[in-house]
């Protein structure tokens, strides 16, 4: 086994002294044999489906647990992490001390000692100058499979000299019974130590915690190098034109960027440096609720051997009912990016974006279907991050909830939101990227905008077939709207058409405007926030 000595050092650093076996960088056939072993019980065991993908059940953990995310507060991090106890603007980055960290390491070690361990070395980041070498360790075969799907596999020469920058331990059975003594939120934890370069995940089986944990790490490392770290998907046209799609989970990042007419760069997490845009991952993590081959053929056809279906309804004949949300509305599939036919070459890297699209799921129905933003409006809406939390993406979310998520990914930001906004908008200005706001939510009749019409809007943006004039705008928000888009009824372009009267639209728009104004007060103490106040909604128009 390559790197055995280094692996043993890694294990010893957390207190793992004995193991029954180490399976290093297993291939998919080995993982399949391990994860479908009939001796496995409960959430460890996987089911082979008719689509040849395996299906896993993550128990009660069908979404992320943001209240269970922690950073060790020490000399390195105390003055730079955006902490949950920040008086001006609280985050999800809850502090723990070194004593609690040591206890969590012991818990991980106790759960992994004398176990069969799966160890996978991979890259987080397709750009060679800015990637992170990651070692992943778990005792659960399908979690190793998930990591293998989601990150970038080194070639043999790279493995021979692989020394990790960061280590991830994912141990779902490591339940912290001392959580009250540690003053934590629950018995589960996603704990990051940036001094020891280690991420510990315990108590939760949800695969998304693995990828989002490393996303949080990249969100710390890259901005300190003046590189934009972004919660977005990305694709490239036949003319090498790059588009970014920002948005919270469930707003359409994966669906809209996976397009047969364009090449996929990545579906969720990207960096933007002087070389261009690069994906952090080597796989995709798509929502599957109501998935059909007719509406989303690329994603549907990616569900095959080596894919992992998470929390889907498996029928007795091993077929999948993608329309059954009994378990969760947040059912998912993880697959290697090469399951998508149209991907960029070299994989997961491209040039600088021509178009940037903010996806917002407006639950009020007052936002236009599409609008064009000025540079400063782009800063304001990026910092505001208005959208709706959609069903199942976090534990406890059932109906769409209007929310503000700074940078369209507040839960994953390690530093203050203004850090990301300044860096991103610097790149946008330098490379003259255009910014659009697309509403993938609801109209005033509480009807969800259709995927068909949304794709027509995206196509119009990317093909330069959308025109805006200053005189055609939505008041209060001062958002420019087009008069006509091929494939979209004119009625849909002005949100006021879906209200019983203009007064009713104004009433709802005023309610939302007040939420914008209230939310942006958390930036009023910052230099950037003071600069952007004048771009907030105007209630008395």
UniProtKB/Swiss-Prot annotation:
<feature type="binding site">
    <location>
        <position position="231"/>
    </location>
    <ligand>
        <name>Mn(2+)</name>
    </ligand>
</feature>
<comment type="pathway">
    <text>Carbohydrate biosynthesis; gluconeogenesis.</text>
</comment>
<dbReference type="GO" id="GO:0006094">
    <property type="term" value="P:gluconeogenesis"/>
</dbReference>
<keyword id="KW-0210">Decarboxylase</keyword>
<comment type="subunit">
    <text>Monomer.</text>
</comment>
<protein>
    <recommendedName>
        <fullName>Phosphoenolpyruvate carboxykinase (ATP)</fullName>
        <ecNumber>4.1.1.49</ecNumber>
    </recommendedName>
</protein>
<feature type="binding site">
    <location>
        <position position="212"/>
    </location>
    <ligand>
        <name>Mn(2+)</name>
    </ligand>
</feature>
<dbReference type="GO" id="GO:0046872">
    <property type="term" value="F:metal ion binding"/>
</dbReference>
<dbReference type="InterPro" id="IPR015994">
    <property type="entry name" value="PEPCK_ATP_CS"/>
</dbReference>
<keyword id="KW-0312">Gluconeogenesis</keyword>
<feature type="binding site">
    <location>
        <position position="212"/>
    </location>
    <ligand>
        <name>substrate</name>
    </ligand>
</feature>
<feature type="binding site">
    <location>
        <begin position="247"/>
        <end position="255"/>
    </location>
    <ligand>
        <name>ATP</name>
    </ligand>
</feature>
<keyword id="KW-0464">Manganese</keyword>
<comment type="function">
    <text>Involved in the gluconeogenesis. Catalyzes the conversion of oxaloacetate (OAA) to phosphoenolpyruvate (PEP) through direct phosphoryl transfer between the nucleoside triphosphate and OAA.</text>
</comment>
<dbReference type="Pfam" id="PF01293">
    <property type="entry name" value="PEPCK_ATP"/>
</dbReference>
<feature type="binding site">
    <location>
        <position position="64"/>
    </location>
    <ligand>
        <name>substrate</name>
    </ligand>
</feature>
<dbReference type="InterPro" id="IPR013035">
    <property type="entry name" value="PEP_carboxykinase_C"/>
</dbReference>
<dbReference type="GO" id="GO:0005829">
    <property type="term" value="C:cytosol"/>
</dbReference>
<feature type="binding site">
    <location>
        <position position="454"/>
    </location>
    <ligand>
        <name>ATP</name>
    </ligand>
</feature>
<keyword id="KW-0963">Cytoplasm</keyword>
<dbReference type="InterPro" id="IPR008210">
    <property type="entry name" value="PEP_carboxykinase_N"/>
</dbReference>
<dbReference type="GO" id="GO:0005524">
    <property type="term" value="F:ATP binding"/>
</dbReference>
<feature type="binding site">
    <location>
        <position position="296"/>
    </location>
    <ligand>
        <name>ATP</name>
    </ligand>
</feature>
<keyword id="KW-0547">Nucleotide-binding</keyword>
<keyword id="KW-0067">ATP-binding</keyword>
<keyword id="KW-0479">Metal-binding</keyword>
<feature type="binding site">
    <location>
        <position position="206"/>
    </location>
    <ligand>
        <name>substrate</name>
    </ligand>
</feature>
<feature type="binding site">
    <location>
        <position position="332"/>
    </location>
    <ligand>
        <name>ATP</name>
    </ligand>
</feature>
<dbReference type="GO" id="GO:0004612">
    <property type="term" value="F:phosphoenolpyruvate carboxykinase (ATP) activity"/>
</dbReference>
<feature type="binding site">
    <location>
        <position position="332"/>
    </location>
    <ligand>
        <name>substrate</name>
    </ligand>
</feature>
<dbReference type="InterPro" id="IPR001272">
    <property type="entry name" value="PEP_carboxykinase_ATP"/>
</dbReference>
<feature type="binding site">
    <location>
        <position position="212"/>
    </location>
    <ligand>
        <name>ATP</name>
    </ligand>
</feature>
<comment type="similarity">
    <text>Belongs to the phosphoenolpyruvate carboxykinase (ATP) family.</text>
</comment>
<feature type="binding site">
    <location>
        <position position="268"/>
    </location>
    <ligand>
        <name>Mn(2+)</name>
    </ligand>
</feature>
<keyword id="KW-0456">Lyase</keyword>
<feature type="binding site">
    <location>
        <position position="231"/>
    </location>
    <ligand>
        <name>ATP</name>
    </ligand>
</feature>
